[in-house]
Each structure stands twice: as structure tokens, then as C-alpha cells.
Amino acid sequence: MSDLLKVQDLHMWIQTDKGLNHILQGVQLDIQPGEIHGLIGESGCGKTMMTKATLNLIDPKRTVIRGHIEFDGQELGKLPEKERRKIGGSRIGYITQDPLTALNPLYTVGEQIAEMLRYHKGMKKKEAAEEAARQLERVGIKPGAEMAKRYPHQFSGGQLQRICIAMAVCCEPKLLFADEPTTALDVTTQAQILDLLKSLQKNGLAILLITHDFGVVSEICERVSVMEKGIIVEEGLTDEIFQNPQKAYTKRLIDSAVRKEGAYE
């Protein structure tokens, strides 16, 4: 099976007041169609920056990138910027860590999902509004037509995360980047969001789950890549990594999950 996403020797430098900071140091990562792949590491290790490099969500004036990123057979670095940005949202969905930062407080959630559909799918206003309501129901926000008229502040944290998932998958992407989607949620809501992601995978969606918590990885990820200081230090099947971690850093991450009550068995 050919890889859906293939990252090879990816380097990133960010300009700071003290000079160039080498954020990503030769990252190697591949994601297969329809799999849930975990990318785990401590905060600040470069997980989010890798996804932003893939989606071109960076400041070119302050950032230098080297390496190869291939998605669905296309070398992203060779695409015009406009075409590459269109891939984000239509063929690659993205859920940020904080749903409030992804939603505009001045517009209803239905309007924001509909805008995605109009931009990427070319839908007319009425058609997009109806599809937005359907997408809300798809992620458990019901009744969709009524909820679509509400503003972000009228929803709970768990509901907002569901809405962000609806926005990320409304254009039927092949790949979803889920960046710490459960971090700010209680245990019950966290389990519901993970179940939702698993249900989306059953429809053929590949997911890169970005987290610092091995307990979350153990719940839904088939494979996992461990990142330390901008480098993938270990990669393999989740069960094998749990049972026989090769790196001390990986073992510390697993031990921290074990110490959390009920993290995994």
C-alpha cells in the first residue's frame, strides 16, 4: 500500500532574536490511507510545527524549510502557494489544540462551516447551509439546523471540539491532523471525541493524532512515531512500542501515562 503522506528529511529553522532555531531536524514520517497514526512527544518538541510545515501555515519571512513532503502522490513543495493552501481544508483537515482559536466569535458555527463548503466545494449559499447542518449532526451536534444558528460561546468545550471536527471534515478530506484534540476536555468527553475520531476512520479517513499522552495513543492509534527535540526517535506498531520501547525517552512517556489513573491497561 502506497503512503498517503510521506515526510522525508524535513528540517525547519525559525528566526529568533538570538538567530536561527533548528526546530525540526530531519523528520521522517509516513501515514498510510485509512490509518490512525500517533505523533507523540513533550510540548515544544516540534509536533505542531511539522503539521504547519505540511499545510504551509508558516511565516516565510521568519522560517526556512528543507526536505520533502509528499501527499497523495504530489510533492507539496513544488506546488504554487495558492494551490498548496487549497489542499489544506479540502484534502487535509486540521483540528487545532484550542477550538476557540479556530472559531470566529462573530459568526454562527453554521456560517463558518458553510463558508468552508462554499470556498472549497463551490456550493451555493443555501446548499452550503443545509450541508453545514448535516455535518453538525454527523458529529453529534443535534438538531443540526437549530444548532447551526448558534455562536461559539453558546457551546461547551466538548461541543466546540465536535464543531471543529465537523469543520475539518466537511469537505471529505483524505487526511486529518488532530492536534491535541482532547487536552482540555474531561475524561468522559475525551472518550467521546476519541470514539468520534474512530468512527470517522471507518469511513476511510486517515488521522494523524498529535499528543503528549501515551494513554490517548493506546486508545486508538495503530502506529506511533515518537518525537524528541525535533527528531523522530522511534516508530512502530503501538502495541510493540508499549511492550518493548527502545529509547529511554519513549519509556518515560509511557511511564507518565501509567501513572495516570486508568490511562491504559
Predicted regions and their residues:
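A short, proline-enriched helix->beta-strand linker immediately N-terminal to the Walker B motif
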Residues: 170-174
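A short, surface-exposed alpha-helical micro-motif characterized by mixed small hydrophobic
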Residues: 217-219
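Helical segment within the ABC ATPase nucleotide-binding domain
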Residues: 191-203
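ABC ATPase "signature
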Residues: 235-236, 244
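Conserved ABC transporter NBD signature motif
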Residues: 63-75
